[in-house]
């Protein structure tokens, strides 16, 4: 067995032992030893392999798999720009705390700076965006007469791989995230003719080489619930049963609120204190409340990042130790304004003469059912889902809220669907046309690759960036330039784009969406709904006026 083959087999075996169920592989020559080892593990049913030609989309596919499966996922690629293309996914995984392992093959390090082809200083390329940069080191030449050497190397390689998995999952830090695992591989890069497929042994019973129980990060915080309190539940909020009775503005990716409070209803209330869970990222009324110096804020998070954008948090912790009882009159008032806000949104939607992205989001929100998985694009869709009063009981909601970019959303949805398929449930993804077009190459799934069994991508197509209609850039005084430089119309034929990738698709009206989503289907499909963005500003103004 040549050194690179031995090293790759040990790494793959130990990754599986460490809990890796899925690996995304991008083709290349330098990562051939890893490719052979991964293909062997896939054939043996030890992991599921996904081959992609684009490293950028591969990274987001891995994010979708990791988030939905709650397990570390690897992306393996060759050296050079292949590694650099993981940049956006690594940044998202960092801030969303997703266990993404970048398994980067490299040339032998002595070739750095010599002009060697497809070679750059890739170890450490991601800087402080990763939890760790770990190099396995170049495997030495192996002597058939020195079994002791292989025993020592096997232990070193397995220990290093365990270190990678532990860093990615946050077992010792309570801070999951991306890790770069850089492996320089010497030639020969393919197994020898007489190779018997063996692998140096790991621990008995399939256990990891180094067992690392997860740490518990626990910081209780005393909070009196007697003052009029609202809860703001953002991305990564976690479950807090002792706060369930409180009125809660829950973002779609947070656990569903038992006592929901519409984000636009905050303007009608005067809370005396706020409990913030996770990391809010969506609503301006929420940001304004959290920044109000007259309102104490208690921040409860599950990780080490500082949870205080406005600098207004009075105390931080991981869970509340509560005392006191909420005022029943306050709870009634919050329920009344929530019901009023939800009704106002729905009434204005019904009265509006044109179909907008908000109408599409309402139709999707009304169509999902328990057991579903809903993937929401950044920009308007995730906000629209909150505005229409969506409360996702029994629904798993995903959205890339780490740094909230639109890139990689198609691939994230496909990865999430592939993981959710194990439950037998369906996945619905809602995204805008720019988000869809930006990651349309994510639709490219080879004929031999695992494909989602039940994924519907709903594209709300208003031919550009509708969110800018609602921001300062959409002010009518900028109309002479805003459509071009912010709205960015593209005139892409979504149906033709889908057909190029052999993806079933059709264009429907928003009123047909509920029936279309309810009809049985197999595989992956795209439903396109034409929408208007020119009237979004007026629609949102009418909703605010109705409140």
From Swiss-Prot:
Gene for this chain: menD
Co-factor(s): Mg(2+); Mn(2+); thiamine diphosphate
Keyword Glycoprotein among record annotations: no
PANTHER family xref list: 2-SUCCINYL-5-ENOLPYRUVYL-6-HYDROXY-3-CYCLOHEXENE-1-CARBOXYLATE SYNTHASE, PROTEIN PHYLLO, CHLOROPLASTIC
Protein name: 2-succinyl-5-enolpyruvyl-6-hydroxy-3-cyclohexene-1-carboxylate synthase
Organism: Mycobacterium sp. (strain KMS)
Domain of life (superkingdom): Bacteria
Enzyme Commission designation: 2.2.1.9
Subunit structure as annotated in this protein's UniProt entry: Homodimer.
């Amino acid at each position: 067995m040549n050194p690179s083959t031995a090293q790759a087999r040990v790494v793959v075996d130990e990754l599986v032992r460490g809990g890796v169920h899925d690996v995304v592989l991008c083709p290349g020559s330098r990562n051939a030893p890893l490719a052979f080892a991964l293909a062997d593990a896939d054939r043996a049913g030890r992991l599921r392999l996904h081959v992609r030609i684009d490293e950028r989309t591969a990274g987001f596919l891995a994010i979708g798999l990791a988030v939905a499966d709650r397990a570390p996922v690897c992306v393996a690629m060759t050296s050079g720009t292949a590694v650099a293309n993981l940049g956006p996914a690594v940044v998202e995984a960092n801030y969303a705390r997703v266990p993404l392992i970048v398994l980067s093959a490299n040339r032998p390090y002595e070739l750095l700076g010599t002009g060697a082809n497809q070679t750059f200083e890739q170890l450490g390329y991601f800087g402080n965006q990763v939890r760790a940069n770990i190099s396995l080191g170049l495997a030495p030449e192996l002597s058939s007469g020195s079994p002791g050497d292989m025993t020592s190397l096997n232990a070193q390689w397995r220990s290093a791989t365990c270190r990678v998995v532990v860093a990615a999952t946050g077992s010792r830090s309570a801070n999951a995230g991306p890790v770069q695992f850089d492996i320089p591989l010497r030639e020969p890069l393919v197994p020898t003719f007489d190779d018997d497929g063996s692998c140096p042994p790991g621990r008995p019973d399939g256990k990891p080489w180094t067992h690392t129980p997860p740490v518990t990060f626990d910081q209780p915080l005393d909070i009196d619930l007697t003052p009029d309190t609202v809860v703001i539940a953002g991305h990564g909020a976690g479950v807090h049963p002792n706060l369930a009775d409180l009125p809660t503005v829950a973002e779609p990716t947070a656990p569903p609120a038992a006592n929901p409070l519409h984000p636009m209803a905050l303007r009608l209330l005067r809370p005396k204190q706020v409990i913030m869970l996770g990391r809010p990222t969506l609503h301006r009324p929420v940001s304004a409340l959290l920044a109000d110096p007259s309102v104490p804020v208690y921040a409860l998070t599950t990780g080490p990042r500082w949870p205080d954008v406005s600098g207004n948090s009075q105390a931080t912790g991981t869970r509340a130790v509560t005392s006191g009882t909420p005022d029943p009159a306050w709870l009634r008032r919050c329920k009344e304004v929530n019901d009023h806000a939800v009704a106002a949104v729905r009434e204005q939607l019904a009265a509006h003469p044109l179909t907008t992205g908000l109408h599409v989001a309402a139709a999707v929100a009304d169509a999902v059912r328990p057991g579903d998985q809903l993937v929401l694009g950044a920009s308007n869709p995730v906000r629209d889902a909150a505005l229409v009063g969506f409360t996702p009981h029994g629904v798993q909601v995903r959205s890339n809220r780490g740094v909230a970019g639109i890139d990689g959303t198609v691939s994230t949805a496909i990865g999430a669907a592939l993981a959710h398929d194990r439950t037998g449930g369906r996945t619905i993804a809602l995204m805008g046309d720019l988000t869809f077009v930006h990651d349309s190459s994510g639709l490219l799934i080879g004929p031999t690759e695992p494909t989602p069994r039940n994924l519907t991508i709903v594209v709300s197509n208003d031919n550009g960036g509708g969110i800018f209609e609602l921001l300062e850039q959409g002010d009518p005084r900028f109309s002479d330039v805003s459509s071009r430089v912010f709205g960015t119309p593209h005139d892409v034929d979504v149906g033709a784009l889908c057909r190029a990738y052999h993806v079933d698709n059709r264009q429907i009206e928003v009123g047909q969406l509920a029936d279309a989503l309810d009809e049985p289907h197999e595989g992956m499909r795209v439903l396109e709904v034409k929408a208007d963005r020119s009237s979004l500003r007026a629609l949102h103004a009418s909703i605010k006026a109705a409140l």
